[in-house]
């Protein structure tokens, strides 16, 4: 009989409304304010943004205005972890509404720090602890209610079938009514509420051990036999249900109104409690939900509850006949009832009763006993009497539990004065700490927090008071850690929150080492204030700031952000540049350590010296290594070049075929036979020859075995220049070179010179454009070499070559041409044959920096056929590193005529540049003139475009030839203009023009030394 009466009492009493589970929503619909958007994408809707709340992230409608962060303690973090593990093990995800509801309830207990805007300069004042206390009491009461409904659901189903139960009939009518506007998210049925409520919503206490039959799962997964209480007799159960039905039938219906106690009222709650964003300095007042469940019941309801308690007190014998399971359920229901009444009394008044003037937490139960939060004294007296009756009934129930040896449920410890204990341990074994953690310093804290809600002792004379004292003795005793507390700490448990801290042997201190030694105290304090400002923490958090040489040390006190010394050190490293810019100091080192270790920090000067020494050592080693590598590389290059030179020379010394040698010697004899025998010889031939050869790199090497003696005749240079003329020309050249302004003006005048006529229409024809290597150097129409079209492979008379006249306009002295292209090689050899040339001067390498300068128009060995001209390589002689000499055997296959051609190839002159030394080029010119002497045919001179290097060589040779013939006046600028009248672009740069003047002066000086004094 007692158990059904208790259930009816639970329905009549107005405990704090439990948070209802959200109504079933289709899985695809996005609910506002969903949690977990930082961990899973796609939770927020199109008009929502994910706001970082410090835990999982919460969706808010754009623009987001409610910015706050949860303050998560280690105990709360463990509770969240357990809840997530249970949800995951059951198969729920962040998309499920049940997961959202459970985690929202878990986060409701956590204090918050509100921000003015997302980038707030400092944290707002956290929400008052009274709000968290209010929600905690609500959860504990809700836990008891949920367990009671789960265990006694069959009794409620049986009661729903009793025709005499007017109260339950009204409950069904309330369930069948359509939902009111704004309440569509909440269930109107007790069974629906229980089906959506899980044990996961209410975490067990710290010392609770859940039995295996209470593993986390939803009620819908339980079987009917698990929901039914295990009673010994079904007859006894029917007696209990019948008695409860009869009692409910005798109870008159309560009038609707503010104090309505219908089951529908128990399940009403607002869709979302409004949370205005207040200033941190203003205490937050939380409005009550719709149909405020915290309002006390009416006087008539209190009288009926009082009568019900008396009925329960008159039937102790029947209560002693209940089973263990029923007694356990009654204990849980009474615990939840008392907690709901305690909580209702504590939260009845405005915020002034719960919050003191200093913003600290007030003692809710004491405030309730003082009557500060009850607007109606009469109602308060009824509640007090009702509370005392519940105490006496609990004492009787406690005796029954002692007789049966029943164990209290982990979720319901609360007979009158619930005692909750939280343990926070941050101890770790010494062996598990790494060296880095030891250096940083580990705060060894072992704390035990006791929170005890004290209720004032009201005088009463009922006999149940003694029984209640016995019930207190039957509560679980304190743990070993509780018993180990000092006596003073145990006596002070009633004062509120107690913290026992076991400090570490030596407190860890943070330090920041700067480049300033010694560091002034005000600079050290300013640096610490900059760190505090960076972390948005008050400067008072940093205690015991000291300056040790170049370092500043500090300790981090307790703070609401739970920032430790190691966190400060890490933030300093991450924001090093910003701190250096703000403080004007250079941060060299940061860390955490004991004060004794900080005193032995190495002086900064020694660190800098060691760093400099290491850097200098590394630089020295690198230099030594570089020198060794360079020396080895140079040696290898020289050795390989000498080896290649020896191989090439030995290859040149090998005899070619007998036919080629015999043919070449026969050609040389024919050439000597046609030479006129009566050439005059100068009187000083040998002397001038010896003086001219003094600029060579060494003694003149003898011709190779593949060369004929007739090709290298030692005919002397004819010179008619006297001493006075030579000195006058030399002084003119020296003055020209020393006067840079004069040279500059002369070159500017040459650049402005325009040749007349200067038409190049033939070179610009469509069929001739591919035959030009450079479009900047095209032959003039009036001055170009004409080929015989009938002998040309392209039947064209065009080739990019210009005849250069000296004193005789009928016989050109030179032919300046471009380097042959693959398509113009046959034209080049045709020009050589038709012009009767026997000397070719080549002034460019084949390739420069990967760019082709000239085509390889001769065979490397043997012979090649170019149209009707067969070219056979006879010899190749390397005179020095700067030039070499090749001899070719040229044959016209149409006429079977043959001719010898000698090529002088200068290797060290690059495009738009000058040779490294004029001496090598002058020696090269002497070799060319010795071979050419006595010939009336022109010399073919080519480089890449046939203008820059070719023009410089022709200018030097032409001026020196004029002086050798006894010219009294020399005008190099006028000579260059004469060359540009015949081919454009001759001598392309000022450096090339200056080089020509230098070469002429050096050769004149050599001639003067050779003349008789």
Swiss-Prot record:
The keyword Hydrolase applies. It is an enzyme of class 3 (hydrolase). Subject to proteolytic cleavage at multiple sites. Its main location: membrane. GO terms for molecular function: protein tyrosine phosphatase activity. Residues 116-137, 273-302, 342-382, 401-487, 673-717 are annotated as: Disordered. A motif (Leucine-based sorting signal) lies at residues 1002-1008. The modification Phosphoserine is found at residues 434-435, 690, 696. Its EC number is 3.1.3.-, 3.1.3.48. InterPro entries: IA-2/IA-2_beta, Prot-tyrosine_phosphatase-like, PTP_cat, Receptor_IA-2_dom, Receptor_IA-2_ectodomain_sf, RESP18_dom, Tyr_Pase_AS, Tyr_Pase_cat. Keywords: Acetylation, Cytoplasmic vesicle, Glycoprotein, Hydrolase, Lipid metabolism, Membrane, Phospholipid metabolism, Phosphoprotein, Protein phosphatase, Receptor, Signal, Synapse, Transmembrane, Transmembrane helix. Residues 419-430 have a biased composition (Basic and acidic residues). Pfam families: Receptor_IA-2, RESP18, Y_phosphatase. Substrate binds at residues 911, 943-949, 988. The tyrosine-based internalization signal is proposed to function in clathrin-mediated endocytosis and recycling. The leucine-based sorting signal is proposed to function in trafficking at the plasma membrane. This is Receptor-type tyrosine-protein phosphatase N2. The lineage of its organism: Eukaryota, Metazoa, Chordata, Craniata, Vertebrata. The gene is PTPRN2.
